[in-house]
């Protein structure tokens, strides 16, 4: 997290989200352009979320896309920016997962209508790899069910963390994505089994044909 001046912060996360506090659109665009050449696997998908922070309240309150806090501190700002960034990250993972789910459904519909798969073994392996890689990235980068260490001994920080997770429905959305990924993985594993059975059947037919050919050759040799 970079402290720019007393009221401005930039928080860059390893999973590709950048969170800004008290920056206008022009400055945000300039910073994104500045860091883009240094990004790995840069995604053209632009997702954003705005969240309002009001200070000077007599107690901590949560509203629609808003939080009211008593006194602003760096730890509070960091915690808020962390939760907002995880909400945006979940939006991204939802989009990617939904695309995979649509592609999987197309294959199941084709299987239902034609009784066969419309995908090669190589492409199937790629889909399985994408699914496993996505599950791994989510597990590695998001801490939906864990709280940052600074909240363990600070009642206000813990209350803010719990409240923000509830406000953004982080746990519900996380479970939904995980369930969708499991469905996708199960379907692809089923496709793989079908493909292996098909390849095994073709191999058996080839072996039978070879045996019959050998038998026919032996019969012809005896008759000649």
Question: What residues fall within each predicted segment?
Answer:
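Perimembrane helix-loop junctions in membrane proteins
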Residues: 102, 106, 193, 221-224
